Amino acid sequence: MTAKEKIKAISDRYGYDAQSRQCIEEMAELTQAINKFWRKQLDCGKIELPKEADETFPVFCKEYDNLVEEIADVQIMLWQMEEFLHCNINPTVERKLNRQMERIENESLH
């Protein structure tokens, strides 16, 4: 069974009402995980994330592991929302990415 088929099966089993509420819960847990990682591993912003993963980056900590888990949970829920709403977000994502790139270009001109 592919990931897309699993998403459809899970969506069909639980329905929009239950899964939309679960999505809200998972997003709240992600918010908390981001905050804990920022606070405990990045010393409230005093430590910057490296541009690329390397041996100095604290990837082997419970806050990092929890953050990765919560990102996965939210991604799964968002795929279910796409399934429920019969939508393809890719064109919207592309449009928004392009808009942000334009903003960055405009910032560098000033």
Language-model-detected regions and their locations in the chain:
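Flexible "arm" and connector segments at domain edges
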Residues: 1-71, 75-110
